[in-house]
UniProtKB/Swiss-Prot annotation:
GO terms for molecular function: mannosyltransferase activity. It comes from Acanthamoeba polyphaga mimivirus. Signal peptide: none annotated. It comes from the Viruses. This is Uncharacterized protein L263. PANTHER family: INOSITOL PHOSPHOCERAMIDE MANNOSYLTRANSFERASE 1, MANNOSYL PHOSPHORYLINOSITOL CERAMIDE SYNTHASE. The lineage of its organism: Viruses, Varidnaviria, Bamfordvirae, Nucleocytoviricota, Megaviricetes. One of its GO terms (biological process) is mannosyl-inositol phosphorylceramide biosynthetic process.
Amino acid sequence: MSVVDKNYHKKTYHKYDHNKWVLIIYVKSVSHETNIDKFFYENTIDSLDSVINISSICLYTLNDQLSKILVDIQPKCKIPINLCVDSDNDILNTMKLHLDNNLSIIYFTNNTGFSVQQKQCHSLDCLSAYTTCIYDDLYSKVLNKFGLSKLITFDTLVVPNNNDSRKFIDNCIYFCRKLIGTDNEFKINLSLTITDSRMGYIVKDLETDLEIPNNNFVRNIVDKSFRQYLTEQFCSVKNNFKKCELPWKDDNFIYYPYLDMNVFPCDESVQNISYTSCNTNGFITNETNPFGKLFTRFNNPYEGVYLKKPQNNIQIPKHLHHIWIDEEPSINYINLWKTILVEPWKYTIWDNNSVLDLIKDTHWDQMYNCAKQSRQKQLIAMLSILEKYGGITINAYNIPLKSLDSLTIGNKFFVSFLAEDTGTSLSYRIIGSLPGGLGKNMIDPNISRKPYEGINNFFRSVNYNKTNDFVIPEIFDKLKSLLHVSVLNSNNTHNNFSKEIDYFLLSLSGQNIFIYPSYYFNANISTLPKRLSNKIIMINLQKYPDKKPIRIKTEVHRPYVVTKEAIADQLNENPKDKLKNIK
């Protein structure tokens, strides 16, 4: 929740300045893990403060237990916040009390709020609300008695300080007292519905009423894309927010199509700001753990986010491990890798027998033999190899397009996304890492030794960690435990066995792990923007029967079509057959 700074806003609706408003935020349910953003749009108070004079904020709950939770998660702002318990759910009398004190009211429930999207807002002139209609046989008999066909519940209610509002609330209280029953929430909704119909539908619908052309109220704040859109609209209204020039020519940034970060943008007016990400809308952020905040927001590959590469002297060993555990190694693939890998690179082929020899009598042995899925076996083989030797592991069906040198610099551990357009699931066709034993009385090549500290400074124990970041041995230990649970869980399907592993790796800070975009290692050329084609490092030719190719029209015009099948045919073709076609 952003702290309100009134210097950032200009009062634009002077006709409301003579009125004082109270915000009523009614929280009916919340868990211990919830923060205010889960049920109330975070920029509501900032946005409304630029429109009206807010005298106070009332945060209502139904019981003392909820009240104790909300003490820690209530929004932080300079406007007084009163935390109240309304065990009787007597919201109508609460509104009457505020009206008697000459205060206008805005009532919010879960997943609602207000955002400055338009320069003019007409939704504060009269009684207005977001409504939800309920058609239920359980209430049909009661509704028929009053000539009603539906029950209206109010998600957001604007009650300006005028005679119509007082009359409306008084009538609601009158009908609510006449109704018999123990369900207070139903009685309140029914009294609101009856009063609205008897007064000629005086409450304007914020969603459909043509008399409210500019509506800044929002509801159902559950979609991350919509929340981020509202946040950017809020930032654009503030004069000191300026859009950043996109770093698409800066080699220190990597572009991720479809993705964005679910965080509040940095204020670019701050002098000498150093940012770690910038989306294609020009909003920047400075997050130490960018990957845990990423989500699929955009609908096309031309919109996304730029993330800064790691800036350090760490270097992964230049050793490529090619995994062939499902079938015999293909000489065509092997020759391609041997051609592109030059000194000091090492190249090792691992088949099923060599993997079994490596993991014999280790903690990986039981997991590998119990794994039922090929993807599980491949991941176990990759991690067991990296733990001992470090370097880069790839599965069988990868062919190189350029050198892998750039992947070894600045990374402790790296993987890639599977397909950004469908989410932030990770791909394990390629994994790179420092040796997993690093820190357990092994030489750490990334620690500088001062002359007077002697040889002991070359060594670091597992407990040595000035920050709370994971070190490589801890990452491998955690991956072992997660894989062990995944292998033993018979309910895991082909697609979700790595869900917990994905979650763990995404939660690590950017100093411990880097996640590359999918097009680096598994590009869909038909959908990829042309300017990114030179970033592709390798192509994966493995086929999955349940994955259908996505085809969209691109701006690239060629007399030929590049497909994975065509590349595979060229690789499988015997060079002698090519000579036969030459006359």
